[in-house]
Amino acid sequence: MAESPAVSIVVVLYNSAGCIGPCISSLASLEYRPFELIMVDNASSDDSAVLARGCAQKDGLDCLVSRLGRNRGFAAATNHGILLSGGEVILLLNPDAEVYPDTLGALVEALREPEVGIAGCKVYYPDRETLQHAGGFIRDNGLTWHYGVNEKDVGQYDEPADVSYVTGAALALKREVLDRVGPLDAGYFPAYFEETDLCLRARRAGYRVVYAPRARLVHHESVTVGKFTERYYYLYHRNRIRFMLKNYSWRFLLDRALPFEQRWLSMIEPEEQAIPLNKAYLVNILNLPRTLAARRRADKILSAPRIEDTVSEL
């Protein structure tokens, strides 16, 4: 990697007019240079693209805004932005996120180690004291969880660490990772699990995924989809199941994932998630041929053994 690699920051907009201003203002405060800013508008029904361009001009940032004719989902829109970019390092950033001045420099520094392919941030809720994410892990049935979530930050996550995945709210990676493992999987339409899938494929290819605590971020979570709505549960569980079917061995699915799923189902409130869960199971059955095709494509690119270092405790 170059001494001061060029960075491409890719932000996908979808009805983001209410949050993109603070995001762009925070990018203007970044100490690291050079970087380019690319924004992809995913057929927003508001004036996200116009507002984003205006905010960038006001803050003195050069910005390329590309408008898609239809909502292609987060992964496909991100891939479109990456195709327009030229940086050796790529930062995928949500429009409802605000970086600290030294965030980008800390991410680039974490990526300097040759074996590190992806780096993620210490993510705060808007109070800037409560942690939202300090790296992530995956349970046996594909449930994702954030280290540190809802904990006050008192320095307990100040050491860098290798993790299973980092949140797509702010994910930095070397371009060579995408050259090796392929783009984000647009099959996770419209959102959820595309970054988890990318991190798993990168690890399978021999790269490390690291949590870089000096890179800090504020994330106003789920402005677009809404957190803990029926739609959220459906999309999350549909893509969780697809993630498992695509990436894990059949023995793992039978011996660990299925028993864990049964145990987890016995512990949750059925009225809260029953309808979206049943719908998610059904849709995955109907979509199984396409998921198996995606599995075969991934296996063709990645001949290394599957990574199944999940957590067995609820």
Range-by-range predicted roles:
Residues R139-S164:
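Short, flexible, basic/aromatic active-site loop/helix in glycosyltransferases
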Residues R67-S85, P95:
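Glycine-rich, basic loop-to-helix element that forms the pyrophosphate-binding segment
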Residues S164-V218:
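A short, conserved alpha-helix in the catalytic core of glycosyltransferases
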Residues R208-D309:
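Active-site-adjacent helix/loop segment of glycosyltransferases
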Residues S26, D41-V50, R70:
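A conserved acidic beta->alpha catalytic loop
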Residues I90:
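Short aromatic/hydrophobic "clamp" motif used to bind/position activated sugar donors
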